[in-house]
Amino acid sequence: MSQARPATLRVAVLGAGSWGTALAAAASRRHPTVLWARDGAQAQAMAARHENTRYLPGVALPPALQVSADLAQALAHLAHDPAHALIILGVPVAGMTPLCTELAARLPALGLQAVPLVWTCKGFEEQTAHLPHETVQAALGAMPGLAAGVLSGPSFAREVAQGLPVALTVASESSAVRDAVTTALHGAAVRIYASTDVVGVEVGGALKNVIAVACGICDGLALGTNARAALITRGLAEMARFGAALGAQQETFAGLTGLGDLVLTATGELSRNRRVGLEIGAGRKLADILASGMTAEGVRCARAARDRARALNIELPITEAVCAVLFEGLSPMTAVSALLAREARPESPTP
């Protein structure tokens, strides 16, 4: 780290879904932490029961964790010592623009515009095909002193909330962001690695969800572990090609936020993206799966990833196949056959 930070930070986690709650729980074990929930009833129930029954039922939250539905109160927690504070955005991609727009109005008024800020969402914004850092830049880029980055890696929220071991990467051009996240979370069961490759970390986090849907489809069709291994490996090549076109560092894709996150999401039993793929492979329609309440970022961002890749003339055959199955009525087996029928070529895991 570039310089020592104090042992104690004030942390505000904005967004009380499963991942926001898990990170707030981890931070609150060592630092004064406030978790902001947009839903007042949810916040009240969490504060009373020390449990997020909606997103992490059965997981006890640390008694020291404060929960509030008042965004002003959550930010005021930081204003007591803005030089030693951290903001973690725990909302999904779809919630980034509204929240960042609100923060653009609130942070300068409280003197918090230079507080290190990280987001944790993975994917592309459906309407714009923006990666999260582009959304943040559009909403907060004019704010003086902005220091921002992304926190990502192979992690299921439930395990993090339970205090089980996890390794994550914080990526930012700002050493203040990297240092603040490390101070807030590194230690005990959480290991933090630092990077400057924001784009590479985000591309890995976005595309691994799409590849995980493909792996779930493969498993749902009972095509075997050989086929799954091929999808993971060639999916990693797609991630690297896409990242290279956007200026990412290739070594990022061999790390936690590339290969690590892809393997976890493509094979883990807690992976929602894999579960959606399993259902598709078993013959269920996407509309029925979504109507049952199952959600997955891979479904939300697949089309945006495909469209942005096409605009950049990047070949993403697995992503194209997933989109054809999800949105164009192509049968899963036909998609597999089309992938297998592609022309033979030399293996090139990197661009």
Curated annotation (Swiss-Prot):
Reported EC number(s) for this entry are: 1.1.1.94
Principal localization?
A: cytoplasm
Which residues does the annotation say bind NADPH? 18-19, 38, 122, 157, 272, 297
UniProt keywords, alphabetically: Cytoplasm, Lipid biosynthesis, Lipid metabolism, NAD, NADP, Nucleotide-binding, Oxidoreductase, Phospholipid biosynthesis, Phospholipid metabolism
Q: What are the binding positions for sn-glycerol 3-phosphate in this chain?
A: 122, 153, 155, 208, 261, 271-273
> Can you state which reaction this protein catalyses?
sn-glycerol 3-phosphate + NAD(+) = dihydroxyacetone phosphate + NADH + H(+); sn-glycerol 3-phosphate + NADP(+) = dihydroxyacetone phosphate + NADPH + H(+)
Active site: residue positions = 208 (proton acceptor)
From the UniProt record, give one GO term of the biological process aspect.
phospholipid biosynthetic process
Similarity comment text for this entry: Belongs to the NAD-dependent glycerol-3-phosphate dehydrogenase family.
Q: Please state what the protein is called.
A: Glycerol-3-phosphate dehydrogenase [NAD(P)+]
What is the organism of origin for this protein?
Bordetella parapertussis (strain 12822 / ATCC BAA-587 / NCTC 13253)
* Gene name, Swiss-Prot/TrEMBL: gpsA
